[in-house]
Every structure is written in structure tokens, then in C-alpha cells.
Regions:
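Catalytic His-Asp charge-relay segment
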Residues: 97-105
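Conserved alpha/beta-hydrolase
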Residues: 30-43
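Gly/Ala-rich beta-loop-alpha elbow adjacent to hydrolase catalytic centers
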Residues: 60-69
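Residue in the alpha/beta-hydrolase core beta-strand immediately N-terminal to the catalytic nucleophile
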Residues: 58, 79-81
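Active-site nucleophile loop of the alpha/beta-hydrolase fold
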Residues: 13, 41, 81-89, 105-108
């Protein structure tokens, strides 16, 4: 974890994964340490926070919110989190970096997210970390925050 990290931008997913639901997935102690913004998936980054310093900022997306992270990805971000994300084939060619952390369970998606595993392989191939877990889709966000952020 980058010790300079101070701003976290989180995109939720569809249906139940609203900003209110995502808020409950983030450990209480994190709210006192970081400036956290949570937005519905599809919200443009510029509408969430106008002035973002990538060196001190994190982009995190769950499910459909993963697409928001992928389309805004830059190696300069302090931390990039992909939580069982929706993906597209074009992102299996992205040059990720050591700032990228992905947790996913391909069995949650069936055939509707066919590029998920190729994106995970690309994350690893280009310097990031991707871990497949055996976990219900709705349980992965809490696990992600508890695993990748420590007091």
C-alpha cells in the first residue's frame, strides 16, 4: 500500500451495490484515515472529484464499477482496485502496473463476463496482482477492503 494514499474513489455496481451499500463494505477505521468518495457505476470521474492527484489517489470499482476504473486507469495512481469487476476484451491489452490489485471469482459471472480471466492474466503479466477467490459476488468487496487496507 502506498503510504501517500489519501483519497479513495469507489464506484459501486448494479442493483444492490449502491453507494449506500458500498459504504457498509468499507471498514469503519478507513473513514477517519482517507477522504472517500463513493459513486454509482457510470459516474464520470470528473463529476466525483474535479482535482485528483494520482500520486495520492486510489480508484476502486466493484462489479459494473470496474469498467469505470478500467476506463480511467493510469499507472500513476497510487492504488487501483478491481473487485470482481465487469470487464471488456480491450482491457486484456492494458499495460497495468504494480499499483493494480484484482480479486475475482469467475464462477460468479458465467458467460456474461468472458474477458474476466484474460484481464486477470494481463494484470499479473504487466506487474499487478490478481487473485481468484471462491466467494459469493456480494461478499468480495468487504473481503477486498479488509485484505488490501490495514490499520
Amino acid at each position: 500500500m502506498n503510504s501517500l494514499l489519501c483519497t479513495i474513489i469507489v464506484w459501486g455496481g448494479m442493483h444492490y451495490a449502491t453507494p449506500e451499500w458500498m459504504e457498509k463494505q468499507i471498514p469503519e477505521w478507513m473513514w477517519g484515515r482517507y477522504e472517500i468518495f463513493i459513486a454509482p457505476y457510470g459516474t464520470p470521474l470528473s463529476e466525483i472529484k474535479a482535482d485528483i492527484d494520482p500520486k495520492t489517489s486510489a480508484l476502486i470499482g466493484f462489479s459494473a464499477g470496474g469498467l469505470d476504473v478500467l476506463q480511467n486507469y493510469k499507472k500513476e495512481y497510487a492504488f487501483v482496485g478491481l473487485i470482481d469487476p465487469s470487464t471488456r476484451d480491450k482491457y486484456s491489452k492494458t499495460e497495468f502496473g504494480s499499483n493494480t490489485f484484482m480479486v475475482y471469482d469467475a464462477s460468479n459471472w458465467g458467460n456474461i463476463n468472458a474477458s474476466l480471466e484474460s484481464v486477470a492474466r494481463q494484470v499479473i503479466k504487466t506487474g499487478g496482482k490478481a487473485a481468484e477467490v471462491n466467494m459469493d459476488h456480494s461478499k468480495i468487496p468487504k473481503y477486498f477492503f479488509e485484505t488490501h487496507f490495514r490499520k
